[in-house]
Amino acid sequence: MLKEVPIKRRQSTKIYVGNVPVGGDAPIAVQSMTNTRTTDIEATIAQIKALERVGADIVRVSVPTMDAAEAFKVIKQQVNVPLVADIHFDYRIALKVAEYGVDCLRINPGNIGNEERIRAVVDCAKDKNIPIRIGVNAGSLERDLQEKYGEPTPQALLESALRHVEILDRFNFDQFKVSVKASDVFLAVESYRLLAKAIKQPIHLGITEAGGARAGSVKSAIGLGLLLSEGIGDTLRVSLAADPVDEVKVGFDILKSLRIRSRGINFVACPTCSRQEIDVIATVNALEQRLEDILTPMDVSIIGCVVNGPGEALVSDLGVTGSNKMSGFYLDGVRQKERFDNDKLIDQLEAKIRAKVAQQHHRIAIEQI
């Protein structure tokens, strides 16, 4: 029930990655990357489809060899989500996947080669209307920038990015987005702030090599959260040493927490204490799993006692306040006469949530007639 926060987005040009708009007034897109071997076509397709199911807007696929490029051709034909080909070292791979319908090319300025090779990629992208992502990474800066700055700095990352933006400008190519990633939160944040002031193109956010699921989620939430709250960012990826599906879930959770883009159930739940009259932790865990299929934005509060329960329920679409044996139930902020049997709480609340979703879908369908 809480409204989206009117964060003033940085103004940028709009490009399209496949059918997904990026930049301008488009919603911030959530991206992930496969971690299968691309030549394992069956496994890669299965992972991409799993990412589609949890809402990934764009999926990046590493294409390190020509064999992987041939596999990419097959993969592209069997999935619906736009695919970005991640290209390093060999520019000819970019030319090959362009023939196979890639939706975006990601190149790394630090290792893709000289200007002539970049021009070959740009000319191909122009001919086929394929956008490019310039992906600068603190771990792979050009040698001369490493020598100039001594270590990765915001200025070094910015200089690397602008060096290649200038090349694309000279080639009269403006269908690109830029990232300046680092594993250090402060380095990444300051680099992105500088970049946001320097270019008008869309910006892809990420804290690279952030770590495992727990630490990486925290790093990403802090770094991306800071930037998003300042209006910076048009696409994002949460980089985790974990299942890529988790990257998408955390990405949407970050956007949801900032009330920038809502998708699915937003559970508001207390951390529990000795006052709780219901098993909040078990209830939330069960409902998160059961309701993963729901895409409709909805706030659901599950509070273990009457201290904060009623207040949270007042600003929720559905709310439960724990009480002895039978718990209070709120709908659209209004206390209902109906109460929930604590022993059947999970089933009863799931049914109410699904009924609320169906009601919303029906109302939207009527309005569209």
From Swiss-Prot:
Q: Which residues bind [4Fe-4S] cluster?
A: C270, C273, C305, E312
Q: Gene3D superfamilies, alphabetically?
A: Dihydropteroate synthase-like, Sulfite Reductase Hemoprotein, domain 1
Question: For this protein, what is the EC number?
Answer: 1.17.7.3
Q: Which cofactor does it need?
A: [4Fe-4S] cluster
Q: How is the cofactor bound?
A: Binds 1 [4Fe-4S] cluster.
Catalytic reaction equation(s): (2E)-4-hydroxy-3-methylbut-2-enyl diphosphate + oxidized [flavodoxin] + H2O + 2 H(+) = 2-C-methyl-D-erythritol 2,4-cyclic diphosphate + reduced [flavodoxin]
Q: Name one Pfam family in it.
A: GcpE
**Which pathway does the record list?**
Isoprenoid biosynthesis; isopentenyl diphosphate biosynthesis via DXP pathway; isopentenyl diphosphate from 1-deoxy-D-xylulose 5-phosphate: step 5/6
Extract the GO molecular function terms from the UniProt entry: 4 iron, 4 sulfur cluster binding; 4-hydroxy-3-methylbut-2-en-1-yl diphosphate synthase activity (ferredoxin); 4-hydroxy-3-methylbut-2-enyl-diphosphate synthase activity (flavodoxin); iron ion binding
Gene Ontology process terms (BP): isopentenyl diphosphate biosynthetic process, methylerythritol 4-phosphate pathway; terpenoid biosynthetic process
Sorted keywords for this record are: 4Fe-4S, Iron, Iron-sulfur, Isoprene biosynthesis, Metal-binding, Oxidoreductase
Task: Give the domain of life.
Answer: Bacteria
InterPro entries cross-referenced by the UniProt entry: Dihydropteroate_synth-like_sf, IspG_bac, IspG_bac-typ, NO2/SO3_Rdtase_4Fe4S_sf
Q: What class of enzyme is it?
A: oxidoreductase
Q: Which family does it belong to?
A: Belongs to the IspG family.
Q: What the protein does?
A: Converts 2C-methyl-D-erythritol 2,4-cyclodiphosphate (ME-2,4cPP) into 1-hydroxy-2-methyl-2-(E)-butenyl 4-diphosphate.
* Cross-referenced HAMAP family: IspG
Q: What is this protein called?
A: 4-hydroxy-3-methylbut-2-en-1-yl diphosphate synthase (flavodoxin)
- UniProt gene name: ispG
